[in-house]
C-alpha cells in the first residue's frame, strides 16, 4: 500500500473487549487489546509519514454470531483442554443469551463503511453499554482506582 502511493484504508477488527475487560475473558481481552494498540500505533505512524492510508479499528459489542459455538472447530485431541469450569460455563451461557439480542452483522458492516467514509478511527456500534463500560474503565484509570466489576 505504501509503495503504490494510492489512497487506502485499513480496518482491524477488535471487540469491545479491546477497550474494556471482563471476568473469564482474559485471553480474549488480551488479544483484542493488542489489536487496538496495533491499530493506534499504525494510525499514528501513517499520520507521521503523511501516507494517504487511513486506519480504523472496529470495536463492536454484541453481534449475532456463532462465536459461542467456536469449540465445534477444536481438534478432537484438544477437546478436553477446552472444557470450562462451572462458573465459566454459567458466564458463557449468559453471554450466549445476550448475543442473541445483538446487532445483525449487516448493520455492523454498514457502520464500518460509514466509519471509513467519515475517517473515524474508532468504529464502535452505538450500544449504550459499550460506551458506559469504556467510560467506567477510563475513569478508573484517571483516578488510579482498582478495576470496577460491571454487573449485568
PLM feature segments, named:
Residues 26, 34-37, 104:
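Conserved cofactor-binding/catalytic machinery of classical short-chain dehydrogenase/reductase
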Residues 20-27:
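Active-site loop immediately N-terminal to the catalytic Tyr-X3-Lys motif
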Residues 39-40, 109:
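Short-chain dehydrogenase/reductase
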Residues 31:
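Active-site helix of classical SDR
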Residues 2-4, 20, 41-53:
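Active-site-adjacent segment of SDR/Rossmann-fold oxidoreductases
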Amino acid at each position: 500500500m505504501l509503495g503504490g502511493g494510492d489512497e487506502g484504508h485499513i480496518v482491524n477488527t477488535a471487540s469491545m473487549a479491546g477497550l474494556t475487560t471482563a471476568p473469564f475473558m482474559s485471553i480474549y481481552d488480551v488479544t483484542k487489546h493488542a489489536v487496538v494498540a496495533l491499530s493506534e500505533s499504525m494510525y499514528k505512524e501513517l499520520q507521521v509519514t503523511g501516507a494517504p492510508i487511513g486506519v480504523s479499528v472496529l470495536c463492536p459489542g454484541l453481534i449475532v454470531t456463532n462465536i459461542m459455538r467456536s469449540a465445534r472447530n477444536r481438534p478432537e485431541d484438544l477437546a478436553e483442554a477446552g472444557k470450562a469450569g462451572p462458573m465459566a460455563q454459567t458466564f458463557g451461557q449468559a453471554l450466549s443469551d445476550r448475543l442473541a439480542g445483538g446487532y445483525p452483522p449487516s448493520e455492523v458492516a454498514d457502520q464500518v463503511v460509514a466509519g471509513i467514509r467519515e475517517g473515524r478511527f474508532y468504529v464502535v456500534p452505538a450500544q449504550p453499554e459499550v460506551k458506559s463500560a469504556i467510560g467506567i474503565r477510563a475513569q478508573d484509570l484517571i483516578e488510579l482506582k482498582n478495576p470496577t466489576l460491571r454487573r449485568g
